[in-house]
Curated annotation (Swiss-Prot):
The keyword NADP does not apply. The lineage of its organism: Bacteria, Bacillati, Actinomycetota, Actinomycetes, Mycobacteriales. It is found in: Cytoplasm. The gene is arsC2. This is Arsenate-mycothiol transferase ArsC2. Its EC number is 2.8.4.2. Belongs to the low molecular weight phosphotyrosine protein phosphatase family. It comes from the Bacteria. One of its GO terms (molecular function) is mycothiol-arsenate ligase activity.
Length: 129
């Protein structure tokens, strides 16, 4: 796998977390992107803090929409959570998978750490596999 696009609804939490963790583990060996189906106005600050606790950085991330060309060309599209819907173009080259990750909203830092650890485990398995 040379490239991956992580997607969630807002691109302010889960997909940014996954991208930051993937960058931490893969450094420059994999091209890493994140996007949202309905981009938020900003990053979820609990996500930023929880990712920093494990040595990754998403503080400079900016929520953005899915780039259709990127969707067509990446090797893997990973949807985080059950709410985001992605229509893959017929010409898409990569595989699509969904990770059922719990929603952290309004649950506080303890819940965010659980979500972070779920994402962390899945990212490591993805990069190893």
């Amino acid at each position: 796998m040379k490239s991956v696009l992580f997607v969630c609804v807002g691109n302010g939490g889960k997909s940014q977390m996954a991208a930051a963790l993937a960058q931490k583990y893969a450094s420059d060996s994999v091209e890493i992107h994140s996007a949202g189906t309905k981009p938020a106005q900003g990053l979820n600050q609990l996500s930023v803090e929880s990712i920093a606790e494990v040595g990754a950085d998403m503080s400079q991330g900016i929520p953005k929409a899915i780039d259709p060309e990127l969707l067509r060309t990446v090797d893997r599209v990973v949807i985080l959570g059950d709410d985001a819907q992605v229509d893959m173009p017929e010409s898409a080259q990569g595989a699509l998978e969904r990770w059922s990750i719990e929603e952290p909203d309004a649950q506080g830092m303890e819940r965010m750490r659980i979500v972070r650890d779920q994402i962390d485990n899945r990212v490591q398995a993805l990069l190893a596999g």
